[in-house]
Amino acid sequence: IGSGLVGSEMCIRDRIRSGDGRTNKYDVEAGNNTYDNAVIENSKISGKNKIQNNQSMLDDIMNSTQYPKQLKDLALKNEEALEFVYDYPAEHVKEHTIDLTEEASMDSVPLFVQWDKRWGYEKYSGNFFAASGCGPTTLSMVVVYLTHNREASPIAVAKYSKEAGYSVDGSGSSWTLISEGCRHYGVKAKTVALDESRMKAELDEGHPIVVNVGPGDFTDTGHFMVITGYDDEGFSINDPNSIEKSGKRWLFRNISSQIRAVWSMYV
């Protein structure tokens, strides 16, 4: 593993950011102001339409009796989960197939989100999994990466968490789901000091790092996430509650005060 990467997550994300990974000729040809202006204008229109569409969906959710209060709260708190909530009436009654074959064969830590329709409508810890399932989702990402176990989906880990007593009603998951529950899946965890150099050393060994964070950039309460690598711009994080935040880099000095616990995960 080179350049502080667990697998090749950084490269994958760079390709995602640039679309299909190819360079458009307009990206390298200078002086095409007409094209550039058109792109900017279309971007503005697209952004405006998205805002209007999101507001329309939110209004429909809030004015309907088809949505449980917990999902309405989620829609208000997390714009990324808005479409997931909006689709609840039609989707929550379906049986969703979960096939993690592709993710289990990846050479990078897969990103799973709590509000995936395949598992987000299930209940966990007194709430919808979409709102309370960061612990099982985080452990699932680590287990699937380290062991290639395609059966260890977020909702499968949630079921185990409940049976083993790691689910805390109204509060999500206990920290021991990570530090002890991982053994159920053949994964080990060791506590690591909140030190940038030490954490980078673990990542260099190919060990993804699970952190629990308090109020700040990622949560108002408590939250589990996976640190997957680092580069000159900062740490890369798989946030099970945000695809957008998972696509950014995070400087240690900006997140260290929010981190409450650190575990290095390995087999």
Predicted stretch roles:
Residues 105-160:
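Active-site nucleophile-adjacent alpha helix/oxyanion-hole segment immediately C-terminal to the catalytic cysteine
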